[in-house]
A protein has these predicted regions:
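Repeated scaffold domains used in trafficking and secretory/extracellular systems
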Residues: 1-6, 44-64, 92-106, 138-150, ...
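Surface-exposed loop/turn elements that mediate protein-protein interactions on large endomembrane-trafficking
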Residues: 1, 25-50, 72-94, 117-138, ...
Protein backbone atom coordinates (compact mmCIF):
# COMPACT_ATOMS: atom_id res chain seq x y z
CA UNK A 1 0.00 0.00 0.00
CA UNK A 2 1.07 3.62 -0.34
CA UNK A 3 -0.14 7.07 0.65
CA UNK A 4 0.83 10.52 -0.57
CA UNK A 5 0.81 13.43 1.87
CA UNK A 6 -1.81 16.15 1.21
CA UNK A 7 0.80 18.56 -0.21
CA UNK A 8 2.31 15.83 -2.40
CA UNK A 9 5.87 16.03 -1.06
CA UNK A 10 5.91 12.92 1.15
CA UNK A 11 5.14 9.28 0.40
CA UNK A 12 4.75 6.32 2.75
CA UNK A 13 4.80 2.76 1.41
CA UNK A 14 4.37 -0.72 2.81
CA UNK A 15 6.38 -3.48 1.15
CA UNK A 16 5.98 -7.21 1.66
CA UNK A 17 8.96 -9.41 0.82
CA UNK A 18 10.32 -12.91 1.38
CA UNK A 19 13.30 -13.46 3.66
CA UNK A 20 14.47 -17.08 3.84
CA UNK A 21 10.97 -18.27 3.00
CA UNK A 22 9.25 -16.05 5.59
CA UNK A 23 7.03 -13.16 4.49
CA UNK A 24 8.11 -9.89 6.08
CA UNK A 25 7.18 -6.24 5.90
CA UNK A 26 8.97 -2.91 5.78
CA UNK A 27 7.64 0.64 5.83
CA UNK A 28 9.50 3.30 3.85
CA UNK A 29 9.05 7.07 4.13
CA UNK A 30 10.08 9.25 1.17
CA UNK A 31 10.31 13.04 0.99
CA UNK A 32 10.43 14.63 -2.46
CA UNK A 33 10.43 18.19 -1.13
CA UNK A 34 13.98 18.02 0.23
CA UNK A 35 17.22 18.66 -1.62
CA UNK A 36 18.96 15.96 -3.60
CA UNK A 37 21.13 14.69 -0.73
CA UNK A 38 19.70 11.20 -1.18
CA UNK A 39 18.70 10.54 -4.78
CA UNK A 40 16.27 7.87 -3.58
CA UNK A 41 14.58 10.47 -1.30
CA UNK A 42 14.31 7.91 1.52
CA UNK A 43 14.05 9.60 4.94
CA UNK A 44 12.99 6.63 7.08
CA UNK A 45 12.74 2.84 7.00
CA UNK A 46 11.01 0.73 9.63
CA UNK A 47 11.57 -3.02 9.54
CA UNK A 48 9.49 -5.83 11.08
CA UNK A 49 11.29 -5.68 14.43
CA UNK A 50 10.01 -2.10 14.79
CA UNK A 51 6.46 -3.29 14.05
CA UNK A 52 6.49 -6.49 16.08
CA UNK A 53 6.63 -8.69 12.95
CA UNK A 54 3.21 -7.40 11.89
CA UNK A 55 2.04 -7.16 8.28
CA UNK A 56 1.04 -3.60 7.36
CA UNK A 57 -1.88 -3.78 4.97
CA UNK A 58 -2.80 -0.09 5.00
CA UNK A 59 -0.72 3.08 5.39
CA UNK A 60 -2.18 6.60 5.34
CA UNK A 61 -1.15 10.20 5.87
CA UNK A 62 -3.76 11.86 8.09
CA UNK A 63 -2.30 15.31 7.43
CA UNK A 64 1.10 16.81 6.57
CA UNK A 65 2.72 15.69 9.82
CA UNK A 66 0.82 12.56 10.94
CA UNK A 67 0.70 9.09 9.40
CA UNK A 68 -0.85 5.81 10.51
CA UNK A 69 0.01 2.21 9.72
CA UNK A 70 -2.67 -0.43 10.17
CA UNK A 71 -1.30 -3.92 10.75
CA UNK A 72 -2.73 -7.31 11.54
CA UNK A 73 -1.63 -6.73 15.15
CA UNK A 74 -2.87 -3.17 15.68
CA UNK A 75 -1.75 0.21 14.47
CA UNK A 76 1.20 2.52 14.74
CA UNK A 77 1.15 6.30 14.51
CA UNK A 78 4.05 8.32 13.12
CA UNK A 79 5.04 11.97 13.17
CA UNK A 80 6.65 13.50 10.10
CA UNK A 81 7.01 16.97 11.66
CA UNK A 82 10.78 16.64 11.20
CA UNK A 83 10.81 16.06 7.44
CA UNK A 84 14.17 14.30 7.43
CA UNK A 85 13.37 11.86 10.24
CA UNK A 86 9.91 10.34 10.70
CA UNK A 87 9.40 8.91 14.17
CA UNK A 88 7.05 6.43 15.74
CA UNK A 89 4.73 8.29 18.12
CA UNK A 90 2.69 5.43 19.49
CA UNK A 91 2.12 1.75 18.83
CA UNK A 92 -1.34 0.45 19.75
CA UNK A 93 -1.47 -3.34 19.93
CA UNK A 94 -4.89 -4.90 19.29
CA UNK A 95 -5.37 -8.46 20.50
CA UNK A 96 -8.85 -8.94 18.98
CA UNK A 97 -9.55 -9.64 15.31
CA UNK A 98 -9.73 -6.33 13.42
CA UNK A 99 -12.89 -6.19 11.28
CA UNK A 100 -12.75 -2.67 9.82
CA UNK A 101 -10.62 0.47 9.81
CA UNK A 102 -11.33 4.08 8.98
CA UNK A 103 -9.42 7.34 9.18
CA UNK A 104 -9.94 11.07 8.84
CA UNK A 105 -7.70 14.08 9.34
CA UNK A 106 -8.13 14.13 13.14
CA UNK A 107 -9.20 10.57 14.03
CA UNK A 108 -8.52 6.89 13.41
CA UNK A 109 -11.09 4.17 14.05
CA UNK A 110 -11.19 0.38 14.39
CA UNK A 111 -13.99 -2.12 14.71
CA UNK A 112 -12.84 -5.34 16.36
CA UNK A 113 -14.42 -8.50 17.65
CA UNK A 114 -15.58 -8.08 21.23
CA UNK A 115 -14.30 -10.91 23.41
CA UNK A 116 -15.94 -9.65 26.61
CA UNK A 117 -19.67 -9.25 27.16
CA UNK A 118 -22.71 -9.78 24.97
CA UNK A 119 -22.16 -7.40 22.04
CA UNK A 120 -20.22 -8.94 19.14
CA UNK A 121 -18.21 -5.82 18.15
CA UNK A 122 -16.09 -3.13 19.77
CA UNK A 123 -15.71 0.37 18.29
CA UNK A 124 -12.41 2.09 19.14
CA UNK A 125 -11.69 5.70 18.14
CA UNK A 126 -8.28 7.35 18.62
CA UNK A 127 -6.97 10.85 17.93
CA UNK A 128 -3.99 11.35 15.62
CA UNK A 129 -1.60 11.23 18.61
CA UNK A 130 -2.89 7.76 19.57
CA UNK A 131 -4.97 8.79 22.59
CA UNK A 132 -8.24 6.90 23.05
CA UNK A 133 -11.22 9.14 22.25
CA UNK A 134 -13.79 6.45 23.06
CA UNK A 135 -14.21 2.68 23.16
CA UNK A 136 -17.65 1.06 23.20
CA UNK A 137 -19.28 -2.19 22.22
CA UNK A 138 -22.20 -2.56 19.83
CA UNK A 139 -24.49 -5.11 18.22
CA UNK A 140 -25.22 -3.95 14.68
CA UNK A 141 -24.67 -5.69 11.34
CA UNK A 142 -22.81 -2.96 9.46
CA UNK A 143 -21.24 -3.02 6.00
CA UNK A 144 -19.62 0.43 6.12
CA UNK A 145 -17.71 2.45 8.71
CA UNK A 146 -16.64 6.11 8.35
CA UNK A 147 -15.58 9.16 10.32
CA UNK A 148 -16.93 12.50 9.09
CA UNK A 149 -15.99 15.55 11.11
CA UNK A 150 -16.94 14.83 14.69
CA UNK A 151 -19.22 11.89 13.86
CA UNK A 152 -18.68 8.14 13.51
CA UNK A 153 -21.01 6.40 11.05
CA UNK A 154 -21.84 2.70 10.90
CA UNK A 155 -24.24 1.72 8.14
CA UNK A 156 -25.62 -1.01 5.92
CA UNK A 157 -28.04 -1.09 2.95
CA UNK A 158 -31.10 -0.23 5.03
CA UNK A 159 -30.01 1.50 8.25
CA UNK A 160 -27.45 3.73 9.93
CA UNK A 161 -26.02 4.46 13.38
CA UNK A 162 -24.24 7.72 14.21
CA UNK A 163 -22.06 8.36 17.27
CA UNK A 164 -20.44 11.58 18.42
CA UNK A 165 -16.86 11.69 19.70
CA UNK A 166 -17.91 10.94 23.27
CA UNK A 167 -19.35 7.61 22.11
CA UNK A 168 -22.96 8.73 22.53
CA UNK A 169 -25.38 7.32 19.96
CA UNK A 170 -26.91 10.33 18.16
CA UNK A 171 -28.94 8.52 15.51
CA UNK A 172 -30.21 5.00 14.93
CA UNK A 173 -32.63 4.61 12.06
CA UNK A 174 -33.70 2.70 8.98
CA UNK A 175 -34.15 3.87 5.40
CA UNK A 176 -37.27 3.30 3.31
CA UNK A 177 -36.47 2.71 -0.36
Amino acid sequence: DMSLSPNGTQLITSYMYLDQGIIKCKIVFYNFGLGKNDPRRVVGIFFPQDLGDAMAGRVRFLDESHAVIFTDKGMQLFSTRVETSPESVKQIPIEENIRSITYAQEYVGLVTDNVEGGDPYSLKIFDKEGNTVFDRTFNYQYTGFDIDGGLVLLYNDSSCKVYNMTGTEKYNGTFDF
